[in-house]
């Protein structure tokens, strides 16, 4: 429980516990303790903490912070974060939102890495041709998986290519959109 309260992204069993007579039960118990502990976190503490001036001028950091604050203000249960590399989900995770972060990526490497990020539930997803198609497909996948329901408000954030930089990779998380699940 202390590891959760201190903001740890992941916990693991010690060698002795993992090799003991009941390793599966030990993992289940650790999971239950972590999930129960998360119910009592002061999520606003993470949003109120001081941020360096350098991070305040960082586009990705600011968009992710704004997404977390908006999700909190609107009581959105999910932040939708499509990301090829998982960068957006990692940036969101550092703010420890109360909302679930749904990380979606076409890269299985990124999906596996996102399993270690705090508050992120990763999903494998296909690439999309446009920003609208990306966000629509992301929400549809989450609807199919039972993560979001019709009528819920979700906050979506991603790094998308602009028309001016169409041939360059996305370097920043640069959009946030508030959506009602249809």
Please place each PLM-identified region on the residue numbering.
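Short, small-residue-enriched loops and turns at beta-alpha junctions
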Residues: 17-22, 53-57, 131
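Nucleotide-binding motor/catalytic cores of P-loop/tubulin-like NTPases across gene-expression machines
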Residues: 88-90, 96-133
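Glycine-rich phosphate-binding active-site loops on the catalytic face of alpha/beta enzymes
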Residues: 1-23
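C-terminal helical cap(s) of enzyme catalytic domains, especially alpha/beta-barrels
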Residues: 17-39, 169-179
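Conserved, mostly hydrophobic/aromatic
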Residues: 3, 92, 154
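Generic secondary-structure signature for well-ordered alpha-helical cores
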Residues: 5, 9-10, 31-43, 68, ...
């Amino acid at each position: 429980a202390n590891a959760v309260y201190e903001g740890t992204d992941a916990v693991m069993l010690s060698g002795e516990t993992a090799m003991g007579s009941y390793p599966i039960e030990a993992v289940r118990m650790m999971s239950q303790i972590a999930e129960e502990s998360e119910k009592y976190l002061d999520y606003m503490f993470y949003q109120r903490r001081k941020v360096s001036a350098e991070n305040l001028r960082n586009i990705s950091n600011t968009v992710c912070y704004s997404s977390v604050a908006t999700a909190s203000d609107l009581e959105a249960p999910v932040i939708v974060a499509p990301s090829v590399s998982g960068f957006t989900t990692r940036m969101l995770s550092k703010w420890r939102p109360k909302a679930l972060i749904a990380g979606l990526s076409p890269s299985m490497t990124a999906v596996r890495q996102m399993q270690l990020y705090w508050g992120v539930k990763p999903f494998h997803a296909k690439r999309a041709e446009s920003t609208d198609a990306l966000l629509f497909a992301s929400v549809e996948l989450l609807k199919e998986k039972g993560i979001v329901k019709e009528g819920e408000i979700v906050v979506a954030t991603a790094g998308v290519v602009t028309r001016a930089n169409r041939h360059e990779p996305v370097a920043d998380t640069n959009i946030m959109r508030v959506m009602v699940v249809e």
